[in-house]
Amino acid sequence: MVKKSKGRQKIEMVKMKNESNLQVTFSKRRSGLFKKASELCTLCGAEVAIVVFSPGRKVFSFGHPNVDSVIDRFINNNPLPPHQHNNMQLRETRRNSIVQDLNNHLTQVLSQLETEKKKYDELKKIREKTKALGNWWEDPVEELALSQLEGFKGNLENLKKVVTVEASRFFQANVPNFYVGSSSNNAAFGIDDGSHINPDMDLFSQRRMMDINAFNYNQNQIHPNHALPPFGNNAYGINEGFVPEYNVNFRPEYNPNQNQIQNQNQVQIQIQNQSFKRENISEYEHHHGYPPQSRSDYY
């Protein structure tokens, strides 16, 4: 197999003729040189001073503990007094600890950066695979133009309609119809009698609404829990018919005149009974109620 590129080759150590390449190489090599000097100071505790002039006559320097102290010691070559030497050692120890912490932090940050780069490459590969499969809804919208965004919106609306239809079919197949009569519960899922779909309705709120309506109790509906009394007049001459059910929770308030009212009612009932007896009308006979009773003397 023929190689398409020359690969990594040894660079010839001559001055570069291209100015742009020269500036780029100087910047990269200078950073690498200062990094190596910092590692040498950290690992070995050495004192280093580096002064570099760029091709544009700019000065760059690096020194540990600092450039001035290292240069002064190199020029004068005089040993420091004992007390100054001790102070210098304390300062150097403190600086070394700070530099060590910074180097450790830099190492951690660089390792995290490499990890994030690997994750980015993996996600990029996954995105390319999904894009090839046709998962257009996972494309980043930040990279789309206005016309592409309008088309993306239309595709999402069509997808919403399809999902609404499938969800309504699923609910109709799995949820029984609790509504009485000819009405259909398709409207609860966004579909009316004409099979028109309303994709703007929330399926989850519709499901909750359906569950509530399906088991809704109508308090106005009459449930005859016991047999009704017969039509006609009772022993007191009162016409009987449908009566409301007894309410267990009903508690009448106390009325101090209740006994007096009951006595008056009893007196009225006695007067009515006496009037019936004077007219020779049976207290169990019904004349004006429904249904009429058959009598032989009518014929």
UniProtKB/Swiss-Prot annotation:
It comes from the Eukaryota. InterPro entries: MEF2-like_N, TF_MADSbox, TF_MADSbox_sf. GO terms for biological process: endosperm development; positive regulation of transcription by RNA polymerase II; regulation of auxin polar transport. Residues 99-133 form a coiled coil. GO terms for cellular component: nucleus. It is found in: Nucleus. Pfam families: SRF-TF. Residues 6-66 form the MADS-box domain. Gene3D superfamilies: 6.10.140.920, Transcription factor, MADS-box. Keywords: Coiled coil, DNA-binding, Nucleus, Transcription, Transcription regulation. Its main location: nucleus. GO terms for molecular function: DNA-binding transcription factor activity; protein dimerization activity; RNA polymerase II transcription regulatory region sequence-specific DNA binding. Expressed in the endosperm but not in the embryo. Detected in young siliques, roots, leaves, stems, young flowers and anthers. Plants lacking AGL62 show a premature endosperm cellularization and a seed-lethal phenotype. Probable transcription factor. Required for suppression of cellularization and promotion of nuclear proliferation during early endosperm development. The FERTILIZATION-INDEPENDENT SEED (FIS) polycomb complex is required for suppression of ALG62 expression at the end of the syncytial phase of endosperm development. Interacts with AGL36, PHE1/AGL37, PHE2/AGL38, AGL80, AGL86, AGL90, AGL92 and AGL97. This is Agamous-like MADS-box protein AGL62.
